[in-house]
Amino acid sequence: MKQIFIWLIKGYRMFISPLYPPTCRFRPTCSMYAIEAIERFGVFRGGWMAIRRILRCHPFHPGGYDPVPELGEHCCHHDSGNKG
């Protein structure tokens, strides 16, 4: 299942993305981020991370360097405040 989603993203990069000017505000690009997140975390968690990233890719966000977190790193921006 993971390979199907990666294949679809690569198809987008090859056939659809070249039709439009580059507009991604992040490095790595959102499509590369999606591929890496799915490879590292699987379809559901990696896909969710990719969707959140794409939703941040707009003119009002500064963008910049935003790599896929390593396994074990805090990746989903949950509140990790002290509970005590």
UniProtKB/Swiss-Prot annotation:
InterPro entries per record: Membr_insert_effic_factor_YidD (IPR002696)
Localization: Cell inner membrane
Keyword Membrane carried by entry: yes
Membrane topology per record: Peripheral membrane protein
Gene Ontology CC: plasma membrane
Keyword Cell inner membrane among UniProt keywords: yes
Keywords: Cell inner membrane, Cell membrane, Membrane
Location (main, coarse): membrane
Record field: transmembrane: none
Family recorded in the similarity comment: Belongs to the UPF0161 family.
Function noted in UniProt: Could be involved in insertion of integral membrane proteins into the membrane.
Name under which the protein is recorded: Putative membrane protein insertion efficiency factor
Annotated organism of origin: Nostoc sp. (strain PCC 7120 / SAG 25.82 / UTEX 2576)
